[in-house]
Amino acid sequence: MVNYSFSRELRLLTPEDFKPVFKNAVPAVSPYLTLLARKNTLDHPRIGMAIPKKHIKRAVGRNRIRRIVREQFRHQQHQLPAIDIVVIAKAGIADLSNQEINKILDKLWRKLVQRCNG
């Protein structure tokens, strides 16, 4: 049985976790989201999010984006290599439906896997 949990070990939590990803990252970009990835020394992927107030004013909107990204990551974690990922939201993402955001994320996960394995 495959475990689809989202435990603490699957998250980037501290600034020290985020810094290496920002320093030299493999990007996957769309008009609404940017995913930055970097190989890690663990045997599983980890994710962190940067959802700026500048682009999504209300906490409800920022939390909706976080929930969607988290859920997608939970289901994709077994297809992803051992990488650290930072998801950055851009302006206009709050206007998209959940299905549109899911489609964008699907494409970006595939791009990241190609670029990190290739």
From Swiss-Prot:
GO terms for cellular component: ribonuclease P complex. Its EC number is 3.1.26.5. InterPro entries: Ribosomal_Su5_D2-typ_SF, Ribsml_uS5_D2-typ_fold_subgr, RNase_P, RNase_P_CS. Pfam families: Ribonuclease_P (PF00825). GO terms for molecular function: 3'-tRNA processing endoribonuclease activity; ribonuclease P activity; tRNA binding. It comes from the Bacteria. SUPFAM superfamilies: Ribosomal protein S5 domain 2-like. The keyword tRNA processing applies. GO terms for biological process: tRNA 5'-leader removal. It catalyses: Endonucleolytic cleavage of RNA, removing 5'-extranucleotides from tRNA precursor. Keywords: Endonuclease, Hydrolase, Nuclease, RNA-binding, tRNA processing. RNaseP catalyzes the removal of the 5'-leader sequence from pre-tRNA to produce the mature 5'-terminus. It can also cleave other RNA substrates such as 4.5S RNA. The protein component plays an auxiliary but essential role in vivo by binding to the 5'-leader sequence and broadening the substrate specificity of the ribozyme. Consists of a catalytic RNA component (M1 or rnpB) and a protein subunit. Belongs to the RnpA family. This is Ribonuclease P protein component. The gene is rnpA.
